[in-house]
């Protein structure tokens, strides 16, 4: 009997293990696996997935494979191999696996974040970049960020001497920036629509952060599934909210004055319908559904990520007040209190920029990048990678590699400064906070400006210290789609030098 069982397992393994068209091809070393269930029984049950994958490198090396059900996934944990996937062979690995949960979120592969590699994806991505170019004219983007950062500071000013959790205020400020970019609309802090946007954004991130077997075994979707129902509910609320803003944009649309991502997408749709592009573009890729999913992707990619990093920066500064004081010393010296810090001040506020870079290293926005998919039979290093193989870049491994980083688990902003402290450096190529290549973060330039300007304004005006209850922020984090930090409070104190400067201005 056991001989028959063994034979059956071997037969199943033969049919389910990927085949290569290249004779004698060498595959990445694999975790053990069983037919149908794959390597699931052999994966660690506890701990964060990115850390577990990193730990497995000790046994299997910087690139290895595993089976998720009947799907092959390759885990990449070294910068040279990661850059090969993302940049050198970026087009070959620019595909996206189609999963049940992501299919619900992207209306079956529309948009830019979760869409598979296609001409439609490339076109929408190009138009999103065009939007950011639009806002770079006359420093519109920087002025908008400064306006929201100033509004945030005005709200925090009312909490002088108190211990508060600032995450909601920060979240709403970032929402307003994204709403302006997407729809040329902004809201007052108490407007209920901001709470609605925060609720569905956090809800989607939370649900996607729970691994669901339905993405490994799609046939399970025929059974009741709480996570799928929650995704449907949050997506429904998101669509209703975005449609309301979208309709307002259509009413105000003026082809002579494009002012938002939605305007650019509407104009592209009109050009395609009138065949004004000269490229024979299919107007159907600009349906309202396509436009709304692309805008929804920008909401998802641009809100939770930036607000989360701002919270992480505050938390690390509370843990490391000497770093905070160094940043404030630079601000006092090079900016003072008579003007608002600008993005150009990066050349002088080196410790602030180094701190931002270090936070993006030690707590990457996404410890595991969204999975890629091989569009063709390809290779990574010396290993053959068959078409349709899923490829997961373990950014955590790159950013915590002891061979590349000195004391990688220690918060050390100075690692991004030269020995004299007078120039910013990147000490190793093993640093990819925004990914790279065709699937790199679309909003990298926006995020860098937001992080710098928000933190420069906040630290110009306030001290943030351990809360009155003496509870330091927990730095373990909760890695969902975005690496979140647990809620925490900080003691807020308006800086005396800032107060004195305001008195001088008013007299």
UniProtKB/Swiss-Prot annotation:
Residues at which heme binds: 441
Reaction(s) this enzyme catalyzes, per UniProt: a C21-steroid + reduced [NADPH--hemoprotein reductase] + O2 = a 17alpha-hydroxy-C21-steroid + oxidized [NADPH--hemoprotein reductase] + H2O + H(+); progesterone + reduced [NADPH--hemoprotein reductase] + O2 = 17alpha-hydroxyprogesterone + oxidized [NADPH--hemoprotein reductase] + H2O + H(+); pregnenolone + reduced [NADPH--hemoprotein reductase] + O2 = 17alpha-hydroxypregnenolone + oxidized [NADPH--hemoprotein reductase] + H2O + H(+); 17alpha-hydroxyprogesterone + reduced [NADPH--hemoprotein reductase] + O2 = androst-4-ene-3,17-dione + acetate + oxidized [NADPH--hemoprotein reductase] + H2O + 2 H(+)
Domain of life (superkingdom): Eukaryota
Pathway connected to this protein: Steroid hormone biosynthesis; Steroid biosynthesis; glucocorticoid biosynthesis
Pfam hit, one: p450
Disulfide bonds: none
Name of this protein: Steroid 17-alpha-hydroxylase/17,20 lyase
Organism: Mus musculus
Gene name of the record: Cyp17a1
């Amino acid at each position: 009997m056991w001989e028959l069982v063994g034979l059956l397992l071997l037969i199943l393994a033969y049919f389910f293990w990927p085949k290569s068209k290249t004779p004698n091809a060498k595959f990445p070393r694999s975790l053990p696996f069983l037919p149908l269930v794959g390597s699931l029984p052999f994966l660690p049950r506890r701990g964060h997935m990115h850390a577990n994958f990193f730990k497995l490198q000790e046994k299997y090396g910087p690139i290895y494979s595993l089976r998720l059900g009947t799907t092959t996934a390759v885990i990449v944990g070294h910068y040279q191999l990661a850059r090969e996937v993302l940049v050198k062979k970026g087009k070959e690995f620019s595909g996206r696996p189609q999963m049940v949960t992501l299919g619900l979120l992207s209306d079956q592969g529309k948009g830019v974040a979760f869409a598979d590699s296609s001409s439609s994806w490339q076109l929408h991505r190009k138009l999103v970049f065009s939007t950011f170019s639009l806002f770079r004219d006359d420093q519109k983007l920087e002025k908008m960020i400064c306006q929201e950062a100033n509004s945030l500071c005005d709200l925090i000013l009312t909490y002088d001497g108190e211990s508060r959790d600032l995450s909601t205020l920060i979240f709403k400020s970032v929402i307003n920036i994204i709403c302006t970019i997407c729809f040329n609309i902004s809201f007052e802090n108490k407007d209920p629509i901001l709470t609605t946007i925060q609720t569905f954004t956090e809800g989607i991130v939370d649900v996607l952060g729970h691994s669901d077997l339905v993405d490994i075994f799609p046939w399970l979707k025929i059974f009741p599934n709480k996570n799928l129902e929650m995704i449907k509910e949050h997506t429904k609320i998101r669509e209703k909210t975005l449609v309301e803003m979208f309709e307002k944009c259509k009413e105000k649309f003026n082809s002579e004055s494009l002012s938002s991502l939605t305007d650019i997408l509407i104009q592209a749709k009109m050009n395609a319908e009138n065949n004004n592009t000269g490229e024979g573009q299919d107007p159907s890729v600009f349906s309202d559904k396509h436009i709304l999913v692309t805008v929804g992707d920008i909401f998802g990619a641009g809100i939770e990520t930036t607000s989360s990093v701002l919270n992480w920066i505050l938390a690390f500064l509370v843990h490391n007040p000497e770093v905070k004081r160094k940043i404030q010393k630079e601000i006092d010296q090079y900016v003072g209190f008579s003007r608002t810090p600008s993005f150009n001040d990066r050349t002088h506020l080196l410790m602030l920029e180094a701190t931002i870079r270090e936070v993006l290293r030690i707590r990457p926005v996404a410890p595991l990048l969204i999975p890629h998919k091989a569009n063709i039979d390809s290779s990574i290093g010396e290993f053959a990678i068959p078409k349709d193989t899923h490829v997961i870049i373990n950014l955590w491994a790159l950013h915590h590699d002891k061979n590349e980083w000195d004391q990688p688990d220690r918060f050390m902003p100075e690692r991004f400064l030269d020995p004299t402290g007078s120039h910013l450096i990147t000490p190793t190529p093993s640093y990819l906070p925004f990914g790279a290549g065709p699937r790199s973060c679309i909003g990298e330039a926006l995020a860098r400006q937001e992080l710098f300007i928000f933190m420069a304004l906040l630290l110009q005006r306030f001290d943030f210290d351990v809360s009155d209850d003496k509870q330091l922020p927990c730095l373990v984090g909760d890695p969902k789609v975005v690496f979140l930090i647990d809620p925490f409070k900080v003691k807020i104190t308006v800086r005396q030098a800032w107060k004195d400067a305001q008195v001088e201005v008013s007299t």
